[in-house]
Amino acid sequence: AANPGEHFGLRHVRGAEVIDIRDGEGTYLKEFRSRTQRDDGEPKQVVGTKRVFTLALDAAQYQMDTTREQEGRGVDVYGRLNLLVRRQAKENNFKAILACIRDLMNVDVVVPEWLHDVFLGYGDPSAAALLNTHEALKTIDFKDTFLDEKHLVESFPKFKVSWTNEAKTRVPPYRVTFPSPDDEAPDVIRAESYVPPDPGPYPEDQPNVNTVRFTPVQVGAIRAGLNPGLTMVVGPPGTGKTDTAAQIMHCLYHNEPGQRTLLITHSNAALNDLFVKLLQRDVPARYMLRLGQGESDLDTEMRFTRAGRVDAMLAKRLEILAEVEKLADSIGLNGEDVAYTCETAGYFWKIHVLAKWEKFTADFAAADAADEDFVRASFPFAEYFADAPNQPLFTGTDRVADMSRAKGCMRHLKTMFTALDECRAFELLRTQGDRSEYLLTKHAKIIAMTCTHAALKRHDFIKQSLKYDNLVIEEGAQILEIETFIPMLLQKNEDGHSRLKRVVMIGDHNQLPPVVKHAAFQKYSNMDQSMFARFVRLGTPYTQLDAQGRARSELAKLYNWRYETLGDLPNTQTGAYARANAGFAHPLQFVDVQGEESAPTPFFYQNIEEAEYVVSVYQYMRLCGYPAEKISILTTYNGQKHLLRDVVNQRCTNHPLFGAPAHVTTVDKFQGQQNDFILLSLVRSKTVGHLRDVRRLVVAFSRARYGLYVFGDHGLFSECFELAPAFETLANYPTALELCVGEKYGACERETSDQGEKTVVENGQGMGALVNAEAGKWQAEQMTRNR
């Protein structure tokens, strides 16, 4: 076969880096991206269709080409180049990351002193974990972590709880004071319930409250994460790593309002999951910033890019200024330009609003204590709050309760003017670039990005003087050592010291490690060992979450043998978890497929029999009424993924009933995600292949909530020693697919122990025939309806 060069007529291929692009008038295209304006205020327009690229060539290759040309052994390569091809950006970040690593080698940067020895592998491995030392926080405000008094007591089984409140008033939130290592009573903690200040009279003033009943181990992880130093959390599949991380960040935001937190993950999907959880908590959206390309996948109406946050701040400014004008009218300042700018509104706050409030509080203190109607009669902003729900605001019969309500109204105004003051910088800064830089370096309290984005943009962050105090790393076991190291150094040192106060690493070293494609680096340099896994090996203390709430207990048995203690949360025994999967006799099965693997190109493994069987089962599920978004098809090889997609496109995508499933992808790509039902194709029929790595097996078997159906060569995989514990569980189920034909999704009340009337499917052809018969019935029903 002809090589690609001969096939496509290529003579020379050279690599280059694009420095800049200009239009027909020689204007840099970068200017269009930053939305610079012409003198008349209109955005600049691109002129003409001609583009001029300035390229940085490979100097060594250029020298070789020119030498060869001068010696008469070659031609002028660069004068003959006539096609410019841009590489896929996702695969093309190596140069920027290499430049970042070189920068780190050439500058004097330091990790925090408390992390130094552990990072290098010296000394006491627990030295960076400050939880059990004198440096640990003595009193922690857990905010809404605990749902009630019983939850708090259950969360600290090793401690006796001493209350400072009477029994009637022990409602959340709580502050907890922990004993020092040398206290007289080291097993007693003091708990205090307190009443948070009234946030205001409007529904939007009320904070979103946590509804997750955290386990004692999760509470221990939250406590460790709030303390300074290094916190390691090992989270097996489904144990609530994301909820725990979100609660740590929520409490950090409230307990350390002056600190900024950097959130790093390996994948965009994990970053978006965590970001959405934070949005559901009591963290104002204006303090959250999402950097990188995956923001468009966020399942939210708000935009969290720099441009999106800047636009939101400007919109917020107009919204609050309208409220300021309404407030001014309500106190008789009609016609005055108090709401013209943020600055004039600030003067209005100090001169009029604060002055009236201070006079009111002074009069309240001086008034007769028996005058219960004072607040209702004298509150200066009653007209402004006339549209608040639950009128009247003040009863006139309880002086203390009315004053508390008045303070809530004032807190609403203070929050409003504080937000307006934060908008002032966006009013003064005129260009989008200046505004987004201010947002990143001064305004945002929680900044989220992937580890790749951190490496790509480190130079920009240093130049912009980014500062942060806390670092939270999710999916820590999937991130390369260097990619974990770089986020610690995205800011300048302060007097030769790192500003970093906390590093929280969350991950699972029993699942897949970082991907290293270069075999020599992987095998001989140990480069596929993450910093998270290295710290665990060194003996650094970690908290291992011990209760999973994702999968049925039958499914969890496939992988919980890999962990010391991994139990099930109560929710896995009720509701949909207790009911059988409609149309299936069992919640999980290994379906023996007598297919032959093939490899059209080396290492591109496919198995057509398995692919057709899997897609037939997907079609059967759709005929039973299963939603397509609840089903994912996974496989262990890229070749099979492409084959499955071809079969799905041919049979399902354009069909009015079937449609495409939520995902058709590889196990490796699906790590960190989950779905209700998983169809898994193992492909190989000659050797076990890379499923022999038990970490990949754990990922593959732990993605499903309610149903897992594995398709493969049973004789081959059941003989594999490494996979034996999982296959002992699968051995309890038959290797021929057993169905309960006629059941419908959502209408099946059968319990998992009841296998119903079983129909045994012997092979893929039998499954195909069953699907064709059921599809024929469905088509006949549609025709009858349309008559």
PLM regions: where:
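Conserved helicase/translocase P-loop NTPase motor core
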Residues: 350, 357-358, 364-469, 479-483, ...
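Hydrophobic residues at beta-strand termini and immediately following loops
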Residues: 291, 367, 381, 545, ...
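Alpha-helical interaction elements in eukaryotic regulators
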Residues: 77, 93, 97, 111, ...
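Conserved helicase motor core of SF1/SF2 NTP-dependent helicases
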Residues: 452-456, 461-787
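Pre-ATPase regulatory/linker segments immediately N-terminal to the P-loop/RecA-like helicase/translocase core
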Residues: 2-213, 300-388, 395-408, 534
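ASCE P-loop NTPase helicase motor core
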Residues: 192-315, 428-430, 434, 438-565, ...
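Short, basic, glycine/proline-bearing loop/turn elements
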Residues: 199-207, 418-424, 471, 680-686
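Beta-strand elements of modular eukaryotic interaction domains
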Residues: 3-9, 17-36, 41-46, 210-213, ...
